[in-house]
């Protein structure tokens, strides 16, 4: 075996092993998404967050797993069987993904003001329509989760929630905000969420879907977060910018590496005897 043949064999098996790893990873992601979709109660008990929009994330994970498995399968079969058509398709798909990521990065960098305004509009619409459609709670649950995790209330301030119809039980009642705005650390009652509403408890199987429980709200003059989420979200993005950029660069470098290996293998295969001819 010549040095050239040895190099081709090394590239072929490297590409195969790497894609086999990502195929297994995609399978795990897909199974994880299906598990969340089918058995929500067990997953809620596992993570301890009953108000997360699990259905959305389960579908995202399932689709991501399928796409990862499909792309990895192209790389595995194309490399192992030395099929130029599959290697070319694999390279083209990776190139498309890489170009999409670059385009999104440029758009986010140049359209930050417009994106921020769009996010603000979506959040304000979610607040205005809070609990008006009990069957459509994904956006509301997502925003509750943001407020709970980032310890904030409303977009600009808690006043965003004032005068929202679903927050008042009667006209004489004062302003109220969702339970996700409640600052439990400001009190000595560590079980406040269990007492306020099952949707914020960490009781797993005892948790109920939002549309089966009364709207959970607390008085605006109680212990609530006084800062809006706009600043907290900006701070979170700033604090995690290095991690986000690092992940994006890592994914981009992986894609470039796989593209390089696949195009090298594709171009250096025997031009006279294509392995695909065996199966014609």
From Swiss-Prot:
Report the superkingdom from the record: Eukaryota
Task: Please give the residue ranges for the topological domain Extracellular.
Answer: 39-59, 112-240
- On the Cytoplasmic side, which residues? 1-17, 75-85, 266-280
Xref: Gene3D superfamilies: Tetraspanin
Gene Ontology, cellular component aspect:
plasma membrane
Q: How is it modified after translation?
A: Tyrosine phosphorylated; leading to activation of downstream signaling pathways.
Q: Does the keyword Transcription apply?
A: no
**UniProt keyword terms in alphabetical order:** Cell membrane, Glycoprotein, Membrane, Transmembrane, Transmembrane helix
- What subcellular compartments does it reside in? Cell membrane
| Membrane topology type | Multi-pass membrane protein
The entry annotates sugar attachment on: 170, 183, 188, 232
Q: Can you tell me which family this protein belongs to?
A: Belongs to the tetraspanin (TM4SF) family.
Q: Relate the protein's function as given in its record.
A: Structural component of specialized membrane microdomains known as tetraspanin-enriched microdomains (TERMs), which act as platforms for receptor clustering and signaling. Participates thereby in diverse biological functions such as cell signal transduction, adhesion, migration and protein trafficking. Upon ligand binding, two signaling pathways are activated, one acting through phosphorylation by LYN leading to cell death or a survival pathway with activation of GSK3B.
State the PANTHER family in the record. LEUKOCYTE ANTIGEN CD37 (PTHR19282:SF263), TETRASPANIN (PTHR19282)
* Subunit structure as annotated in this protein's UniProt entry: Interacts with SCIMP. Interacts with SOCS3. Interacts with DECTIN1/CLEC7A.
Q: What is this protein called?
A: Leukocyte antigen CD37
Q: Which organism is it from?
A: Bos taurus (Bovine)
Taxonomic lineage per UniProt? Eukaryota, Metazoa, Chordata, Craniata, Vertebrata
What gene is it encoded by?
Answer: CD37
């Amino acid at each position: 075996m010549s040095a050239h043949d040895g190099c081709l064999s090394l590239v072929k098996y490297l590409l195969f092993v790497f894609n086999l790893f990502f195929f297994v990873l995609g399978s795990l992601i897909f199974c994880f998404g299906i598990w969340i979709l089918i058995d929500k109660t067990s997953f809620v008990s596992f993570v301890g967050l009953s108000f997360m929009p699990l259905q959305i994330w389960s579908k995202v994970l399932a689709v991501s797993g399928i796409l990862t498995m499909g792309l990895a399968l192209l790389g595995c079969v194309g490399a192992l069987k030395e099929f130029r058509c599959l290697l070319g398709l694999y390279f083209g798909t990776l190139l498309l993904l890489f170009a999409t990521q670059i385009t999104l990065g440029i758009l986010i960098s140049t359209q930050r003001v417009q994106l921020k305004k769009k996010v603000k509009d979506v959040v304000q619409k979610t607040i205005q329509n809070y609990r008006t459609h009990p069957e459509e709670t994904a956006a509301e649950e997502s925003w509750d989760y943001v407020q709970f995790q980032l310890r904030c209330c409303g977009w600009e301030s808690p006043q965003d929630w004032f005068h929202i119809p679903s927050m008042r039980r009667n006209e004489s009642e004062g302003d109220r905000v969702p339970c996700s705005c409640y600052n439990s650390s400001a009190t000595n009652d560590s079980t406040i969420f269990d007492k306020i509403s099952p949707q914020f408890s960490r009781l797993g199987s005892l948790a109920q879907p939002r549309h089966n429980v009364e709207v959970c709200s607390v008085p605006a003059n109680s212990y609530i977060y006084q800062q809006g989420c706009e600043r907290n979200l900006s701070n979170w993005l700033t604090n995690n910018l290095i991690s986000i950029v690092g992940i994006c660069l890592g994914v981009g470098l992986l894609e470039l590496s796989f593209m390089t290996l696949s195009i090298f293998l594709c171009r250096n295969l025997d031009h006279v005897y294509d392995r695909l001819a065996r199966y014609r």
